[in-house]
Swiss-Prot record:
InterPro entries xrefs: Restrct_endonuc-II-like, tRNA_endonuc-like_dom_sf, UPF0102_YraN-like
SUPFAM superfamilies assigned to the protein according to its UniProt record, in alphabetical order: Restriction endonuclease-like
Organism: Nitrobacter winogradskyi (strain ATCC 25391 / DSM 10237 / CIP 104748 / NCIMB 11846 / Nb-255)
Molecular function (Gene Ontology), one example: nucleic acid binding
Protein name: UPF0102 protein Nwi_0116
Family designation: Belongs to the UPF0102 family.
PANTHER family: UPF0102 PROTEIN YRAN
Length: 118
């Protein structure tokens, strides 16, 4: 089951990245890992960075509820580490998005799904 879930996650992240590229984003990193947490996708469009959490579930509604506050905090902490490791992006605006993936559905991109104050 773990292996199947891992591969399903990779597939969802590939779909999410392709969707972002089609929307004009450039993918800067995938599965950026730190001791504080992981960011599924770091994407850039113009002077904006999007730290994207990808959630794949049986339905888009189920995926929408899958990002917990604890996960949000880990993503925020990982984003801070990413920004420290990439000072060339320190002047960019940034936000935390979610990409919801479900079978036989177009991905749903939630802009600003959460913020650093949550």
């Amino acid at each position: 089951m773990r292996v199947a879930a891992f591969h399903a996650g990779l597939s969802a992240e590939r779909r999410a990245a392709a969707y972002l590229i089609a929307k004009g984003y450039r993918i800067l990193a995938r599965r950026f890992r730190t001791p504080y947490g992981e960011i599924d996708i770091v994407a850039r469009r113009r002077q904006l960075l999007a730290f994207v959490e990808v959630k794949a579930r049986r339905s888009l509604d189920d995926a929408a509820y899958a990002v917990t506050r604890k996960q949000q905090q880990r993503i925020i902490n990982a984003a801070q580490a990413w920004l420290m490791a990439h000072p060339e992006h320190e002047t960019f605006e940034f936000r935390f998005d979610a990409m919801l993936i479900a079978p036989r559905r177009l991905p749903r991109h939630l802009l600003g799904a959460f913020d650093a104050s949550t």
